[in-house]
A protein has these predicted regions:
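Pocket-lining segment of extracytoplasmic ligand-binding domains
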Residues: 11-103
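Short, well-ordered coil/turn elements that cap or connect secondary structure elements
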Residues: 2-4, 39-40
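Helix N-cap/coil-helix junction residues
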Residues: 3, 108, 149-150
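Short beta-strand-to-loop elements that line the ligand-binding cleft
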Residues: 3-12
Length: 161
């Protein structure tokens, strides 16, 4: 899709300014900047979410996963999964409190923007990715293996007890 290029690592919050100033030609924006990039004086040339939707035939975007060593044992892994699920459910059931907390890390963004961003990710798919989420994760790793970006390995997805 893009090919090889020279890249510059930086904090995600520095990307809009680096693009505006010409320090870099392009940047991958994440977090709430995916919603506010226009207000920050930069233009979208590719939406990775839209690209993924197209190539995956509508599977959810595998934004992040929790990776744990098998040596922790299934019981501890399942407990950790359960605690994370309960935390997300609590946030979903207490949006005003979750937003109050999120605003501490909002880097000057409006509460309305942060609410829109939070509601994109505090949802049922975040609690349980389901079959579609598992397919998405498998597809992502299959693509990465095919391109030589990750070594071949056996993907194991923890199932709720």
């Amino acid at each position: 899709m893009i090919g090889k290029f020279d890249y510059v690592e930086m904090n995600f919050s520095d990307i809009p300014e680096a693009v505006r100033s010409g320090k870099v030609d392009v940047g991958l924006v994440i977090h709430e900047t995916q919603l506010s990039f226009g207000e920050e004086g930069i233009q979208k040339i590719l939406d990775v979410g839209e690209w993924w939707h197209e190539i995956s035939e509508g599977l959810p975007v595998p934004l992040g996963v929790n990776v744990m060593s098998e040596k922790l044992g299934e019981d501890l892994i399942h407990k950790f999964d359960l605690y994370l699920q309960e935390s997300i459910k609590f946030a979903r059931d207490n949006i005003p409190d979750a937003l109050d907390y999120a605003m501490k890390y909002s880097r000057g963004k409006s509460r309305e923007l942060i609410e829109k961003f939070v509601l994109m990710y505090v949802n049922e798919v975040t609690v349980d990715m389901g079959e579609a989420g598992e397919k998405a994760v498998k597809l992502m790793f299959d693509m990465a293996k095919e391109k030589g970006l990750v070594p071949d390995f056996e993907l194991k997805i923890s199932k709720p007890l």
